[in-house]
């Protein structure tokens, strides 16, 4: 039997590096992945939770940011945990490797465009009569 996941998508938020009680580095993050098909003229998006450990977690937290385009290679995992006396199950991708798919220059352009969009939105709101 074989369990392999390959995803290409954008990070929903900047990955934050954390440490476990046993001092292991971990990053939990969400990847926005477009579906192949369109139902209403626009692609639907799946938000897939993933986790990276150790040096891989440190590298991801250091070099990736919100909106970064990356490919991820890993395996699907399920886990069970208890929260307030209730048993919960989670499914996530355990990341074995990743690759950033945009250069620093491309990332700077994307971030600059996002900042300009926010400025334009603020200017439009100033024109509102109320």
What residue ranges belong to the model's regions?
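Acidic, gly/ser/pro-rich intrinsically disordered tails
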Residues: 1-2, 22, 40-43, 86, ...
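Residue-level recognition of specific faces of alpha-helices
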Residues: 4, 28-30, 49, 59, ...
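Core FKBP-type peptidyl-prolyl cis-trans isomerase
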Residues: 4-45, 89
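OB-fold and OB-like beta-barrel modules that bind single-stranded nucleic acids
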Residues: 8-11, 31, 66-77, 95-98
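Conserved positions in beta-strands of structured domains
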Residues: 12, 16-18, 53, 77-79, ...
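Disulfide-stabilized netrin-like
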Residues: 43-54
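Beta-rich strand-turn-strand
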Residues: 53-88
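C-terminal structural segments of small proteins and small subunits
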Residues: 80-92, 96-104
